[in-house]
Each structure stands twice: as C-alpha cells, then as structure tokens.
Regions:
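Active-site flanking residues adjacent to catalytic metal/cofactor-binding acidic residues
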Residues: 41, 48, 79, 177-178
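FAD-site-proximal beta/loop scaffold in flavoenzymes
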Residues: 2-27, 121, 129-208, 212
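Short helix-coil transition/hinge motifs at the ends and kinks of transmembrane helices
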Residues: 26-31, 64-66, 184-190, 218-223
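A Rossmann-like FAD-binding core segment of flavoenzymes
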Residues: 56-164, 170, 218-219
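C-terminal, flexible cofactor-proximal segment of oxidoreductases
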Residues: 202-234
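Rossmann-like NAD(P)H-binding beta-loop-alpha module
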Residues: 14-71
C-alpha cells in the first residue's frame, strides 16, 4: 500500500480499521496475527509519522473502540535500509525519534532491505521473514521530472533546487514548493523535510512574493520554515 494521494491515505485508514474488524471476527490465530501486524518500509518523515500514528491508535483507539481485541497483539514494525531513522535530519534528531518510537512499542529494523512481499509474507535480504497483511511502502519516493528544465536544476530525490524565495535555480519566474523543492541552507544541508508544515509555510510565503515580485520586495521568511512534527518526538 502507498500513501501518495489523499484518496490513498483515506483508503489505507479504512484498511487499518477493516483489519481490526477481521481480526476481531476470525478464529484463525495465524490470520489474526497477520492482520494485527503492520509493516512500514521506509524510515523517512512519512514512515516516522505513520509509525507514530499507528502507535497512538494502538494506545488510544483500540482499547476504546475494540475492547475485545488484545492490544498487545498489534505489532508495528518500521524497516529501513539505512543505518538510522530520518537520514535527512541530524543524528541527534534521529536518535531522539528512535527512542520515542521504541518507547511507543514500535519495532525498528535498520540496515535491512525488503527482498519480496507475496501472500502476506515479507522477505528480508538476510533471509528472515515477517507475516503481515498490512505493508506500507514509503521508501525511495522521488519527485517527477518537469519537461524543459535542465538536469542541473535537479538535486537528490529529483527535487528542484530553489533559493530562499523558492525560485528554481537560474530562473526568476519559475517557483517550486513543498516536496518538490530542495532549499539547501546551513541549517538544512539536505533541504527541508518533505512534510506538511514546510510546504504550507512555503506556499504562504510564495503568495506574498508573487504579490510583491514586481516591486522587488521578496520576503525572506522562507529561510525560517519550521521542521514540523516529524523532526521532534511525537
């Protein structure tokens, strides 16, 4: 399952609730275990937020809405091929988030690659496997290319290199915001995290800039975008 659109996100939320319903009504212990195991592949901002949301759902929603389900049987497993969570953030932020997710009961597997997933069986590159009916793939996401822009406009993840006003490199009248924008600074050497808060703030700043561009009064607030909730413990 992916999380690339609002419709997909709503569908996945319904799938989570449907898994709870099925687990509640099955007498097959193996099937129940698969339904209550949630695997997230990719420990970037999206994967971290999803893991935290599921952990909070287990803590606050399950006991209230599904009192007959044993919440201890719900597993949340976060898998990433890298050595740490949130590779785009500082090591300190990565460690803080790791500690917090561990405190919430999220199982974290680092330096692990997914080799295959079929028939509710996820196989890792070391030969180990996990049975689950719920796998969310949020790893390796990159932006689409825009026809007509030279290759040097693109950075890691195919994101467009922009200045502090969100103007694409070498262009004064083309802008990029949100996930597609790569605004490199001393504070964010790998660009801002691809989450909601920076995108909203960039959009608001761009509105002001478009209104003022003719008078050459571009705002400089874009350098101060907040990281959003993914950068801190939930």
């Amino acid at each position: 399952m992916s999380l690339k659109t609002t419709a997909a996100a709503l569908h996945n939320r319904n799938q989570v609730l449907e898994s709870f319903e099925k687990a509640l009504n099955t007498n097959d212990s193996k099937k129940r275990e698969q339904l209550m195991t949630f695997i997230i592949v990719g420990a970037g901002a999206t994967g971290i937020e999803l893991a935290g949301a599921l952990a909070e759902m287990r803590k606050f929603i399950l006991p209230h809405d599904y009192p007959d389900l044993d919440t201890s049987t719900m597993r949340i497993i976060l898998i990433d091929g890298g050595p740490r969570l949130l590779s785009a953030f500082s090591p300190q932020s990565s460690e803080e988030v790791k500690k917090y997710l561990t405190h919430l009961g999220v199982e974290i597997l680092l330096n692990q690659q997914v080799k295959n997933y079929e028939n509710n069986m996820l196989v890792l590159d070391d030969g180990n496997f996990i049975e689950s009916a719920n796998v969310y793939w949020v790893a390796g996401v990159k932006a689409n290319s825009l026809a007509g822009l030279p290759a040097e406009c693109y950075g890691p993840g195919n994101r467009l290199r922009v200045n502090e006003h969100n103007q694409i490199q070498d262009f004064k009248n083309i802008f990029a915001i949100g996930d597609t924008a790569l605004m490199i600074s001393e504070e964010y050497p790998k660009g801002h995290p691809q989450v909601v808060q920076p995108a909203i703030q960039q959009a608001m700043n761009l509105i002001k800039n478009l209104r003022n561009i003719e008078s050459h009064e571009l705002n400089k607030e874009s350098e101060k975008y907040r990281k959003g909730p993914a950068a801190h413990p939930f």
